[in-house]
Amino acid sequence: MEVQRAQVGSERNARAGPKVPAWMGGQRYGGRTGVLLCTHFPSSMSDFAAFGAPDTTDFASTRVATAAAAAAAAFTAPASVPASALAADPELLRRAYRLMHTAAAMATLYEEEKTVAARYVHATARGHEAVQLAAAFLLTENDYAAPYYRDDAMLLGMGLRPFELMLQLLAKADDPFSGGRTYYSHPSLRRPGFPIIPHQSSATGMQAIPATGMAHALAYFESQALAVPGNEESRMRNEELEGGKHSQSSLPVSASKPVVLCSIGDGAMTEGEVAEALQMAILHQLPIVYLVQDNDWGISATGREMRAMNAYEFAAGFPGLRRLQVNGADFGSSHAGLTEAFAHVRSRRGPVLVHAKCPLLGHHTSGVRREWYRSDLATHQEQDPLPRLHQQLLAAGVSVEELAALAAKAQATVRDDWAEALAAPNPDPATFANHEFAPPAVTAEAGERRPAGAEKTLMVDAALHAVDDILRDFPEALFYGQDVGGELGGVFREAALLAKKYGDARVFNTPIQEAYIVGSTAGMAAVGARPIVEIQFADYIWPALNQLVEELSKSCYLTMGKFPIPALIRVPIGAYGGGGPYHSGSIESTLLTIRGIKVVYPSNAADMKGLMRAAFLDPNPVIMLEHKGLYWSKVPGTEDAKTFEPATGYVVPLGQAAIAQAADADKLRRGETALVVTYGMGVHWAKTASRDFPGQIEILDLRTLNPLDFEAVTAATRRHGKVLVLTEEPLMNSFAESLAGRIQRHCFEVLDGPVFTLGAANLPAIALNVELERQMLPSAAKVAAALGELLAY
């Protein structure tokens, strides 16, 4: 194939913005950036055979050139759709053509203006425009989408203005997605007339699980004959959108069943979390299209370096997953294949994977430039979807003049929008902390804590009854995790009989997939479901941290409050005598380093029931740590964990500590008292230890670790002047040590001694042997010794 380099334009012309390409009678795209353009337009994918002859003229690295050539040789896809088939909908083709020019002009402009545009890292769709637009055109306002960071053309296809995308590129205050808080082409959108797009992170493959969670929520609502929340409102197109700044969608109004589109790159397909998502989509036959855009590059690694098979071949290992291949560089092929995929999912309600081969014409990102390592640019350039569509439109009878006018209009829009975006205001620094959390639903204790006729109940039963009440009262609620469904109802019987009562669609087992269990809640919540999930043991939460950190914790903040995630995550925790190194751990300090989540840790049955319901009602992700040693009150000294059971509907607000034991008023006046600040099992160790010091010990039960009731802590500290912070965790670098430091700083003038701390030994695991476990952990005797020393100080 004949390949030429774009001519370097004058400085004046470069600043003027993108020009009409040479094949339309004007200058080539690229300006001073030197973008390669082909003068021969392949008519079918047989031309991809030439993808094995990279131009290495400007690249010195033989190793990189060899790898690139190997990648190019593997670049194959199905044949293009004939021009005669495309002619059936010329308006669709014109729209695709105009938006391809828009996306290409934006990419070129960003290069020409890189001093400004590359201040913040970004990636563009160059080479992927055809398949992205084809997908966007098939979405309706009832649908849900999870794009990835190279999908700016897809966003244009949904109807977003270049101006809106540029606001995010420049991190401006009016960025409609994040208000300047996250990267270009990281959308979050909840706007009438558009698909719903929840928070999107940069971590590769992260979107697969939340997207599958969205599909799971849709399937759940359908199984219960419930309306999907928000779909009725989404059809109200006449609502004024933010003073007219933002675009109206060009998507069709549709009463068809909603679907989810998950867009993902080929490099991300090797992530283990993607396999978890596919497993669940097939197990539950969820309505989702996985669109894999395969350009054979993962930054500088080629496909042959990073995978044993492509996505289409990988999908063959998942029976029940329909798979299709399209030529992602050809709009007709992409639209035909995706039309089939969407139709299947809308009617059959099962998952489809579409594998689209695409050339990568731009940089990986503005910070990792193609010329540093790629020698296959010429061969990729030969598959540019824009000149291909140009030729197909000519063959369909559209005139050169009309195409030139469409291109010129697109480029003028890009230039005008760029000027408007540059002039837009930056965020007000005073707003930097807004939207860490959505406002809580419960702000005060409500309901009867000890109703007439109440009997004492175990913590495990209080938890069970709380979830039972929630499932009865809230049809959007569902409960899932390992072993919570079916006959068992949880390894601690904390979900006993719930599956039988509410059905397998609402209470069900999952595979051993902690990442899915947690990450799916982000998608569930975006659709309007209210998930309660369980990690079977705290020791096994670690695979879920990726989703917890990147998706759940950041969503509310980075979407400016549009997508808080109301998810209740139950985690049995703590040692209970012989549980050993993988069933006894305490993890609260790790969780408390994650901003944007709330952490609750009850010590008795009444608080368990009240906090469980409040946590469910909270519009933010809440982790409920439930001590296994307190579930049954079988551990000596934990009898007080049994309490009278509160009435249905009882709530305890998150972030409110409670005095579990007060000191004697006379001893308090004489300065003979001390304060224990603790939670969970620590409350019971402290109660037992305090018997050695009658009337001298106040115990403050934190109940919620984040948000922390530090006001209650400081008030109690000022009453006593002597403080012990008690935890079950290893003490070094723990939450307890941090809290002790805060008390020391804020209450220094009223302290009568150093703030004491007590926790487990600083060891990596809890030993299986119960005698070794006792040596490692705090106990009532150890607490009593510490209190004796503190009181005598």
What spans do the regions from the language model cover?
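Glycine-rich ThDP/TPP pyrophosphate-binding loop and its adjacent helix/strand module
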Residues: 199, 205-226, 256-415, 423, ...
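Cofactor-binding active-site loop characterized by glycine-rich and histidine/acidic residues
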Residues: 105-108, 112-229, 252-284, 302-319, ...
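Short, basic, low-complexity termini and linkers enriched in Ser/Thr/Gly/Pro
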Residues: 4-8, 25-44, 224-256
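A short, small-residue-rich loop immediately preceding and capping a beta-strand
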Residues: 118-122, 145-147, 199-200, 227, ...
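Glycine/charged-rich beta-loop-alpha catalytic/anionic-binding loops adjacent to active sites
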Residues: 112-117, 182-201, 258-261, 296, ...
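Active-site nucleophile and cofactor-binding loops and adjacent substrate-binding regions
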Residues: 120-128, 149-150, 187-208, 326-331, ...
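A glycine-rich helix N-cap at a beta->alpha junction
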Residues: 171-177, 282-291, 507-509, 553-571
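Conserved acidic/glycine
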Residues: 44-131, 137, 228, 356-502, ...
